[in-house]
């Protein structure tokens, strides 16, 4: 008997061991991400053909210590490779793992290849050809610490390649992984099986192949073991013929009902084609359907619902996924009492949105992603009908009740105020409760939830659960559609980090602020193009601007310039270093019919521009960053260190009766009044007057000043 190593994913070792035992393997030993066993040739062929879970089966030729590249070379060279394959065989070396001395898998593969080639040349034989694209035989080397295992890949390519899937849907599961999920779900042939988000059908196809007794490797055209010298062709043909007979007869015996639902016609067509190639098309009832409107089909009694819903590696997809999982949970409880569900996801937080208690759970990584399969027994008690309620009402769980109650109170108070003020966008929650450290801003009928990064003392799992609770409760309290809820994560703002781009969605909406229309981008940046805490400051500038020449420095998207123009400014000059934001500022002006040569837009480093220009203005607004070391600026800037230098330049540009409105976001900013006095300037702190009601609890979000020439 030969020694073999069957490779699988972490968490599936015991399941694979059971499968191999049923196939006749002996001396079975579970190891990390694999199973060792012994078998004769016929049993090894049968394992390759019939395994549904293993990704590769390696015939182990040698195990040896690998401290460095010399150990690796000598260990590989000790094998008499000419006994296993001829020099006409096209080979490739797959190298998995590293250690302190061998840090590169390509280098490791090269050393093994050199040892193999040298073994042939020392025997006066032509060296075998290396073929990375279509090798006849793959040499497999695994390195873990100082332990090396070297052998021959019996399959040649991954055993997940069943031959039926030429196209896949979004984020497809490997066939071996899908088969394992079906087996872990507790499903047995004879039970109805339904996938409400079937995609390209892999879960259902794997289950149907089990029910029909179709060998998963039956459609493979090439096998690595066919190129090994001791290949027993007669034994293989007998095993393959036996499996072929079972595949022809099996489907007709199947009584199990399989149901697959998919929203997209194109993906559904792929699923049907895949099932056809697998030989199980007639066994699966594929239908177009929405998982959030799922109903139990006729004949689905005491079955299993299995699915792998999306779980969003991109954070911005989370609000819509919360709704998806919540509605899926509702449908399961409403329509599938007496059945069970197995849901596979990479997010425990999203699984909690099902609002169902898991009966079992299995940690089953999907590649590099940590995922879990949870199974649920769906009982009639999951659904509660109150007097006067519609049939099939699902009792709702109270999510984050303290947060939800605070949000309700805030909304009741702020909605009335905002309507009276005449504003479309405002903050409805600002980290009011320490356990729910987020800000929520309303932009028309959109919501932006900004999660402040949790302190290091808060475990990541708890922080993730809390923001998930914020999302769920916000959606429930406000009733806002999930595609209009945007989640962002940010540090507490230190200066303005609006220039950090998050995506390229380029989705804009128009909001109104005191009669002024402004364009905002809710998706692409941490900030939207409009700082809500400066709302009163902008209105004040509009009230002050009539007949005046107005200068806006560090202008961002020019919203202050628009207010000034709409307030009757004689001219506006808008300066920012970013062409993108200057273009945005021009669009904002055009939205309000403020066009003409009196409105100038200049791309420049504001600090340098101040030193070079002699123009004067009646009204100047400057809201500089707290700190900047932009590559496009010639020098660093610190608002505390440099504000007097800034005022010295601004004084030169300020007309006799002019005013500077100066603001910044440094929480501990201290105006140097003594040096300001030496410059001949007066400063009046107006921070309390510019703090809007929706930011009243965050008194240090900005500080604002009016600065004028000292009276003689």
From Swiss-Prot:
Pfam families in UniProt: Methyltrans_SAM, RlmL_1st, THUMP, UPF0020
UniProt-annotated location(s): Cytoplasm
Main location: cytoplasm
Swiss-Prot/TrEMBL catalytic activity: guanosine(2445) in 23S rRNA + S-adenosyl-L-methionine = N(2)-methylguanosine(2445) in 23S rRNA + S-adenosyl-L-homocysteine + H(+); guanosine(2069) in 23S rRNA + S-adenosyl-L-methionine = N(2)-methylguanosine(2069) in 23S rRNA + S-adenosyl-L-homocysteine + H(+)
GO cellular component: cytoplasm
EC number: 2.1.1.173, 2.1.1.264
Domain THUMP, residue spans: 43-154
A GO term, aspect molecular function: RNA binding
Keywords: Cytoplasm, Methyltransferase, RNA-binding, rRNA processing, S-adenosyl-L-methionine, Transferase
InterPro entries noted in UniProt: 23SrRNA_methyltr_KL (IPR017244), DNA_methylase_N6_adenine_CS (IPR002052), RlmKL-like_Mtase (IPR000241), RlmKL-like_Mtase_CS (IPR053943), RlmL_1st (IPR054170), SAM-dep_methyl-trfase (IPR019614), SAM-dependent_MTases_sf (IPR029063), THUMP_dom (IPR004114)
Disulfide partners: none
Family label: Belongs to the methyltransferase superfamily. RlmKL family.
Function: Specifically methylates the guanine in position 2445 (m2G2445) and the guanine in position 2069 (m7G2069) of 23S rRNA.
NCBIfam families listed in its UniProt record: PRK11783.1
Protein known as: Ribosomal RNA large subunit methyltransferase K/L
Organism in which the protein naturally occurs: Photobacterium profundum (strain SS9)
């Amino acid at each position: 008997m030969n020694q073999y190593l069957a490779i699988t994913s972490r968490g599936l070792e015991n399941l694979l061991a059971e499968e191999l035992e049923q196939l006749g393997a002996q001396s079975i030993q579970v190891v990390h991400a694999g199973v060792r066993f012994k078998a004769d040739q016929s049993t090894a062929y049968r394992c390759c053909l019939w395994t549904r879970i293993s990704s590769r089966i390696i015939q182990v030729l040698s195990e040896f210590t690998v401290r460095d590249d010399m150990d690796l070379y000598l260990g590989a060279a000790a094998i008499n490779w000419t006994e296993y394959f001829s020099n006409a065989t096209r080979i490739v070396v797959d190298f998995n793992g590293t250690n302190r001395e061998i840090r590169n898998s390509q280098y490791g593969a090269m050393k093994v290849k050199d040892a193999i080639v040298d073994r042939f040349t020392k025997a006066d034989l032509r060296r075998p050809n290396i073929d990375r694209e279509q090798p006849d035989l793959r040499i497999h080397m695994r390195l873990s610490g100082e332990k090396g295992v070297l052998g021959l890949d019996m399959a040649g390519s991954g055993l997940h390649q069943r031959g039926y899937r030429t196209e896949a849907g979004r984020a497809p599961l490997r066939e071996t992984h899908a088969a394992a999920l079906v087996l872990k779900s507790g499903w047995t042939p004879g039970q109805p099986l339904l996938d409400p988000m079937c995609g390209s059908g892999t879960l259902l196809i794997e289950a149907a192949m089990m029910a029909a007794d179709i060998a998963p490797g039956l459609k493979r055209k090439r096998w690595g073991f066919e190129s090994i010298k001791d290949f027993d062709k007669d034994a293989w043909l007998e095993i393959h013929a036996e499996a072929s007979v079972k595949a022809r007869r099996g489907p007709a015996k199947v009584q199990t009902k399989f149901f697959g639902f998919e929203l997209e016609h194109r993906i559904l067509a792929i699923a049907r084609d895949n099932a056809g190639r697998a030989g199980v098309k007639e066994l699966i009832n594929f239908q177009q359907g929405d998982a959030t409107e799922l109903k139990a089909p006729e004949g689905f009694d005491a079955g299993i619902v299995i699915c792998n819903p999306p779980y969003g590696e991109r954070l911005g997809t989370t609000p819509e996924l919360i709704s998806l999982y919540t509605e899926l949970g509702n449908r399961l409880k409403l329509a599938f009492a007496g059945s069970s569900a197995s849901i596979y996801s990479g997010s425990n937080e999203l699984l909690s949105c099902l609002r169902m208690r898991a009966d079992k759970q299995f940690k089953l990584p999907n590649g590099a992603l940590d995922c879990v399969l949870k199974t649920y027994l769906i009982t009639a008690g999951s659904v509660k009908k109150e007097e006067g309620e519609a049939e099939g009402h699902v009792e709702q769980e109270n999510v984050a009740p303290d947060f939800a109650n605070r949000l309700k109170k805030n909304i009741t108070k702020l909605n009335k105020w905002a309507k009276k003020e005449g504003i479309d966008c405002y903050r409805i929650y600002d980290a009011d409760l320490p356990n729910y450290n987020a800000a929520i801003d309303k932009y028309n009928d959109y919501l932006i939830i900004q999660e402040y990064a949790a302190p290091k003392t808060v475990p990541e799992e708890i922080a993730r659960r809390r923001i998930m609770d914020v999302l769920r409760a916000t959606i429930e309290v406000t009733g806002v559609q999930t595609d209009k809820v945007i989640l962002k994560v940010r540090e507490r703002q230190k200066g303005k980090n609006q220039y950090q781009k998050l995506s390229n969605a380029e989705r804009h909406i128009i909001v109104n602020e005191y009669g002024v229309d402004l364009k905002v981008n809710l998706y692409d940046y941490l900030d939207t193009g409009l700082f809500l805490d400066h709302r009163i400051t902008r209105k004040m500038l509009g009230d002050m601007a009539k007949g005046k020449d107005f200068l806006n420095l560090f202008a961002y998207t020019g919203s202050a310039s628009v207010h000034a123009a709409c307030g009757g400014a004689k001219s506006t000059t808008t300066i920012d270093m970013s062409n993108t934001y200057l273009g945005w500022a021009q669009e904002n002006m055009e939205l309000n019919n403020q066009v003409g040569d009196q409105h100038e837009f200049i791309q420049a480093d504001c600090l340098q521009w101040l030193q070079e220009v002699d123009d004067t203005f009646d009204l100047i607004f400057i809201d500089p960053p707290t700190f900047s070391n932009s590559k496009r600026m010639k020098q660093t800037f610190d608002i505390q260190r440099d504000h007097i230098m800034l005022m010295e330049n601004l004084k030169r540009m300020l007309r006799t009766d002019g005013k500077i409105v100066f603001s910044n976001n440094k929480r501990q900013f201290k105006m140097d009044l003594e040096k300001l006095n030496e410059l001949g300037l007066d400063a009046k702190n107006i921070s309390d007057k510019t703090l809007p009601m929706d930011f009243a609890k965050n008194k240090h979000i900005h500080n604002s000043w009016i600065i004028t020439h000292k009276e003689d």
